Amino acid sequence: MELLEEVWTQYSVLITYIAIYEPNPFHGNKAGHSHKLSLYNSLYLCDGGEDDQNIPLQPLIQPERQVDVVFAYDNSADFQSWPNGNAMIATYQRQFSHQGNGTHFPYVPDENTFINLKLTEKPTFFGCDAKNLTSLTGSLDAAYDTPLIVYTANRPFSYWSNTSTFQMRYDHDQRDSIIRNGFETASRLNLTWDSEWRTCVGCAIIRREQERRGIEQSDQCKRCFERYCWNGKTDTTFVFANFIDACVQFLKRQFKTLQNSTVRWVPYNPVSWFKYLYTRIRWYL
C-alpha cells in the first residue's frame, strides 16, 4: 500500500505540469476552423506527449497541407527507454476521435508487432499503397493526400542512446555519442547496411505523386518497398524486452565502439513503470 501511495504521489506531481498563459493571445479570435481556444481568457498548455503522441505528426497530416511524405523519428521511452511504436499508434487512433478533425493516418500495428517483426530495428514505411487506405479515407483522392510515413526508431548502433527521460545533464562525450548514433540510425550506418538507402528515401518521397499520375515504380523502388514497407502482418505475442541477448551479442561483434560491455538497463523508476503498466492495461481493455 505504501508503494502504491508513493507511486501515485509522484504520478500526481506530473499531472500538475501544466503551463497557464494569461492573457490568451487567441481570445476572441474568430479566424480558423476551431474557436475553442478563443473562448477563454487563459490558455492551458501541456507536453504534447501526454496523449502518447511523442512524434509531432498531427500538424503534418492536415489535408490542407498536402504533405506527401513524413519522416518520423521516434525517440520515445516506451519500455526500457526504447520506442515500441506507441507514438505511431496514438496518432493512428486519434483520427477516429473528435479531435481527429478529418485527418487521415496510415494503418499501423500494435506495440508487440513493432518489436516482434523488427519494425523498430530498421526504417519502416507505412501507407505504401494509397489504394489500401480507402477504407480509412472514403475515397482514393483523399488517400492520395494521406502522407506515406517513413518511421525510424532510436536504436543502438554505436551508443546506448536509451537515456532516461529524467536525465537532464549530459557531458560532451555523451552528447557527441548520441548525435553520432542518431546519424548512424538515420543513414543505415552511413549506408553500410544498405547502399541503396538514399534511393529508397527518394522512392518514398515521390510515391504519392507517382500514384496520382498512374506512374509505375522503377525496379529499384520496388526492391526498396519490398524491403522497407510494412506488409500488414502482425505478431501480438507479448515481449518483455526490446532487445534479446542474441541481438546484443551481434551488436557487440559488429561494433567495437559500444560504450558498455552489457545492456545498460535504465534505473527503475516507479513513475515510469506505473505509466507503462497503465498503457498496457488500457491497450488490452
Model regions: which residues?
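Catalytic domains of lipid- and phosphate-ester/thioester hydrolases
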Residues: 1-281
